[in-house]
């Protein structure tokens, strides 16, 4: 595997920003499908792929989500062409016969409901990270948010399912509106150890 060039690394990481302001031009469904097609290949435990992606694009759906968000997140949701609810499906073990066929009993690994939920939350968070990097790879900006009422979002969007919300992320073409100066990051020695 070859190292990516500096321009690509800049687009994905070092020059990318979390956006608050958005060009409201809609994103074609084909772009949303292409983004999922990239995201789904990111690794998860036992290939379980517990994340579920609800693409909120209509004015009606945006209003439903915005009213359940905190502070300034509502206007961001209304302005962005798409905000994605990244959830995790507690029924994910039922898909393991398809996704992990070489281990026929894999779904029985998740009989403990607490362990199952932790696995789903952890791996949907991984998938959410892949999703944001995938969006940047396709030339989109992202704006992740966790300021919303999870229980209310679950009731509003996931009623009748075993899906729970993890976080939300707006995607599209960002503007400089509300873009803060880049904040510092922890240095290697503050965040890492080589053992």
Swiss-Prot record:
Pfam family, one: Nitroreductase
Catalytic activity, EC: 1.-.-.-
Molecular functions per Gene Ontology: oxidoreductase activity
Entry keyword NADP: yes
Membrane-crossing segments per the record: none
InterPro entries: Nitroreductase (IPR029479), Nitroreductase-like (IPR000415), Nitroreductase_HadB/RutE (IPR050461), RutE-like (IPR023936)
Top-level taxon in the UniProt lineage: Bacteria
Top EC group: oxidoreductase
Keywords: Flavoprotein, FMN, NAD, NADP, Oxidoreductase
Source organism (scientific name): Caulobacter vibrioides (strain NA1000 / CB15N)
CC cofactor: FMN
Family: Belongs to the nitroreductase family. HadB/RutE subfamily.
Xref: SUPFAM superfamilies: FMN-dependent nitroreductase-like
Name assigned to this protein: Putative NADH dehydrogenase/NAD(P)H nitroreductase CCNA_00059
Organism classification: Bacteria, Pseudomonadati, Pseudomonadota, Alphaproteobacteria, Caulobacterales
């Amino acid at each position: 595997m070859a190292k990516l060039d500096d321009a690509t690394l800049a687009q994905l990481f070092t020059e990318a920003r979390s956006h608050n302001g958005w060009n409201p031009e809609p994103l074609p469904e084909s772009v949303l499908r292409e983004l999922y097609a990239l995201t789904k290949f990111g690794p998860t435990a036992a290939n379980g792929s517990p994340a579920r992606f609800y693409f909120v694009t209509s004015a009606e759906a945006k209003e439903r989500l915005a009213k359940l968000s905190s502070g300034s997140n509502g206007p961001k949701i209304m302005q962005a062409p798409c905000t994605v609810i990244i959830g995790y499906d507690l029924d994910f073990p039922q898909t393991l016969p398809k996704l992990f066929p070489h281990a026929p009993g894999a779904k029985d690994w998740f009989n403990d409901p607490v362990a199952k939920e932790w696995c789903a939350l952890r791996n949907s968070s991984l998938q959410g990270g892949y999703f944001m990097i995938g969006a940047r790879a396709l030339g989109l900006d992202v704006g992740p948010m966790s300021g919303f009422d999870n229980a209310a979002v679950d009731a509003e969007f996931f009623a009748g399912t075993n899906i729970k919300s993890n976080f939300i992320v707006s995607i599209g073409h960002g503007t400089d509106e509300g873009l803060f100066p880049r904040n510092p990051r922890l240095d290697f020695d503050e965040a890492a150890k080589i053992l």
